[in-house]
Swiss-Prot record:
Binding positions for substrate per the UniProt entry: 176, 284
InterPro entries per record: Creatinase/aminopeptidase-like, Met_Aminopeptidase_Type2, Pept_M24, Pept_M24_MAP, Pept_M24A_MAP2, WH-like_DNA-bd_sf, WH_DNA-bd_sf
HAMAP family: MetAP_2_euk (MF_03175)
Record field: compositional bias (Basic residues): 41-54
Similarity field: Belongs to the peptidase M24A family. Methionine aminopeptidase eukaryotic type 2 subfamily.
Keyword Chaperone set for record: no
Compartments reported by the entry: Cytoplasm
Principal place of residence: cytoplasm
Protein name: Methionine aminopeptidase 2
Binding site for a divalent metal cation 2: 207, 276, 309, 404
Compositionally skewed regions (Acidic residues) per UniProt: 18-29
Coiled-coil residues: none
Organism per entry: Schizophyllum commune (strain H4-8 / FGSC 9210) (Split gill fungus)
Positions with a binding annotation for a divalent metal cation 1: 196, 207, 404
Length: 423
């Protein structure tokens, strides 16, 4: 520890008495004294400049709530993409700009809610990208991400918090894996890990994902999926048809190959996974953006939110359920079923209070004090009240990758709210 030396004020310098001479009675002396007195007075009046308040900065690991970093409540806008073709007029339309202003005045609809969630996402994921290393357990990685999310979004019940369980799916597991209690899986040097993070503010969910590798073998797989996601974003827009967007995604994805052990393997889009529309407190709102061309003539509409996500694989390009389930969500249209199990009634009450229709995992139930709940949870699933989302796997030995962004179809422009410098 550095020794701090006390800085004592300098003692007044003693002027040695001068030898008196015949001029010691000079009349100018009083004038000089008076001038010195005036100077002393002026010095006393001089005020020290006020120190400017230092702007709040994010900590490492990130724990500073965003309201402290953005005290005016205005959060960074996402990437803006103008509409094209028949919708190009929207960018300059007075009518559409007026509609956008009205939307922003509604405290529930304001874009600031989703932009806050997006900024939380960017700061948390960029810390995760710097920090995650082989040798860490899946539980350590999940906690690293979720602790940061809770702190930055300033978790407050259903008002703000985690948007869904942190996905950490490895290798041929494409989606819906997060560690349950007691999980001992350790991240390996050769793993391909999909990191899917959700943040919600007043029910506005930001859903964005990226893929991490620690050696170059599967770089082309990641490049293919990232390019396919950006193609989907480019083609998305008001009145865009979902089937046509899917065709563009497929074309981009299939233009890539990966070389593994001297063999070229085509990258396939995972045909039975898709992007989706998002509603308040509802992660899957009904519309699907598939990854292979189809005849779906459904159109995207003004004001809608979409998660544009693509998955690529070196395997079959199809996934099946497998492994221990961790992800669950209460159904939006859950039936009113009389529950005979007292434990199921109690668990449902807890789910409604803490999560509503926001997806959750077993670790989150542990965190709120629930125990011995598996029988009750399975009963709620069997009764159609809660949906389970088991992990999804392509064939053994294959590798899968994912990239995803949340977009907002504003009346005037398309905003990629979760875009960052990283992807």
């Amino acid at each position: 520890m550095t020794d701090v030396i006390d800085a004592k004020p300098e003692e007044a310098k003693k002027v040695p008495p001068e030898v008196e001479d015949e001029d010691s009675g000079d009349e100018s002396a009083p004038e000089a004294s008076a001038a010195g007195g005036e100077a002393t007075k002026k010095k006393k009046k001089k005020k020290k400049p006020k120190k400017k308040k230092k702007a709040a900065e994010q900590s490492e690991p990130p724990r500073v709530g965003l309201s402290k970093l953005f005290p005016n409540g205005i959060y960074p806008e996402g990437e803006i993409q103008p509409y094209k073709d028949d919708n190009a007029y929207r960018t300059t339309s007075e009518e559409k700009r007026y509609l956008e202003r009205i939307t922003c005045e509604d405290p529930d609809e304001t874009y600031q809610n989703i932009r806050k969630g997006a900024e939380v996402h960017r700061q948390v994921r960029q810390y995760a990208q710097r920090t995650i290393k082989p040798g860490m357990t899946m539980t350590e990685i999940a906690n690293l991400i979720e602790d940061g999310t809770r702190a930055l979004v300033e978790e407050n019940g259903l008002e703000a918090g985690i948007g869904f369980p942190t996905g950490l799916s490895l290798n041929n597991c494409a989606a819906h894996y997060t560690p349950n209690a007691g999980d001992t899986i350790v991240l390996q040097q050769g793993d391909v890990m999909k990191v899917d993070i959700g943040v919600q503010v007043k029910g506005r969910i930001v859903d964005s994902a990226f893929t991490m590798t620690f050696e170059p073998t599967y770089d082309k797989l990641l490049e293919a999926v990232r390019a396919a996601t950006n193609t989907g974003i480019r083609e998305a827009g008001i009145d865009a048809r979902l089937g046509e967007i899917a065709g563009a995604i497929q074309e981009t994805m299939e233009s890539y190959e990966v070389e593994v052990n001297g063999k070229l393997i085509p990258v396939k889009p995972i045909a039975n996974l898709s992007g989706h529309s998002i509603d308040r407190y509802t992660i899957h709102a009904g519309k699907s953006v598939c990854l292979v061309k189809n005849d779906d003539q459904t159109k995207m509409e003004e004001g809608e939110y979409f998660a544009i996500e693509t998955f690529g694989s070196t395997g079959r390009g199809r996934v099946v359920d497998g492994g221990e389930c961790s992800h669950y969500a209460r159904k939006v249209d859950a039936p009113h079923v009389p529950l005979r199990l007292t434990t199921a009634k109690s668990l449902l009450k807890s789910i409604n209070k803490n999560f509503g229709t926001i997806p959750f995992c077993r670790r989150y139930l542990d965190r709120i004090g629930e125990s011995k709940y598996l029988l009750a949870l399975n009963h709620l699933v069997q009764q159609g009240i809660v949906e389970d989302y088991p992990p999804l796997y392509d064939q053994q030995g294959s590798m899968t990758a994912q990239f995803e962004h949340t977009i907002l179809l504003r009346p005037t422009v398309k905003e990629v709210v979760s875009r960052g410098d990283d992807y």
